[in-house]
Amino acid sequence: MKQMTFADAEYAGKRKQTRKELFLIEMDQVVPWKGLIALIEPHYPKGEGGRPAYPLMAMLRVHLMQNWFGYSDPAMEEALYETTILRPFAGLSLERIPDETTILNFRRLLEKHELAAGILAVINGYLGDRGLSLRQGTIVDATLINAPSSTKNKDGKRDPEMHQTKKGNQYYFGMKAHIGVDDESGLVHSVVGTAANVADVTQVDKLLHGKENMVGADAGYTGVEKRPEHEGREVIWQIAARRSTYNTLSKRSALYKAKRKIEKAKAQVRAKVEHPFRVIKRQFGYVKTRFRGLAKNTAQLVTLFALSNLWMARRHLLTNAGEVRL
């Protein structure tokens, strides 16, 4: 008898499915499980002596659900007991649910071996094999991620690796997520985490894969091409012009209209860099740092952007696999 898949099990005897169920069914089909298991398995404990370790596949699925749904370690343990749909996705039963310490230790294992970057590479390689490879242009941008500013914690102080910055007329405390995005597919290929007070323009060289012939960015990156780290870089810099450079022109003039047309074309290309930010903040609910320190939070951001690539490409993947279910 053919074994039922997660999706089959959820469809059996059901009249209506929740958004979370449909989301998990889609992710079950598009995540490159074999590639991710191969990445992590060499570092995963074999459970020799004492109680056997939980299956790696189960812990990986639990880890991804934490990122998708924003669960803390204790909340993830409770959710596995309380929310029926999560257990079959992870391949777990009520008789043996990993506790919050086990869930924490799995995340620490990934952090120790710096596997978040590997997760992004595996997912992007998988997408590339399915026709979503990187092209020749990169769009760069950054977004602020708030960190808890309260000192009401066991250390009695704010995270020393987070900093304050001003945007517009408002002050923010936290970090920045800087990303490099393919200009055609909109998929993230590079992620850097810094304190919030680090200038965006200083991180561009870390966001390029090196094969670009075009780099696009908003006006906040004005002058990037003059920085020493880009000396000799043969790319076309499509940086948005500051409004002050053409607002003095008559709006009826041919020059003004030409500049506006050029800026509109630039903006249409740059818009793709906003999609991953929207996915991690609105779809995955990531609006505030969840750990202390840049390293741990950056590792989570890399994982989130890797998962955002799968989310943005899911229709392409499901349609090409002939498995899309509505």
What are these regions (language model features)?
Residues 1-34, 41-42, 319-326:
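Charged, often Cys/His-bearing segments associated with DNA-binding zinc-finger transcription factors
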Residues 54-59, 79-82:
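Non-catalytic DNA-binding core/recognition domains of DNA-processing enzymes
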Residues 32, 51-57, 95, 265, ...:
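Secondary-structure capping and boundary motifs in well-ordered enzyme cores
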Residues 4-10, 213-214, 219-295, 299:
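Helix-centered, glycine/charged polyanion-binding patches within enzymatic domains
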Residues 2, 6-7, 74-81, 90, ...:
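Polybasic low-complexity intrinsically disordered regions
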Residues 58-70:
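Alpha-helical support elements that line or immediately flank enzyme active sites
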Residues 37-57:
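An N-terminal domain-cap segment
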Residues 49-51, 70-72, 110-111:
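N-terminal core-binding DNA-recognition domain of tyrosine recombinases/integrases
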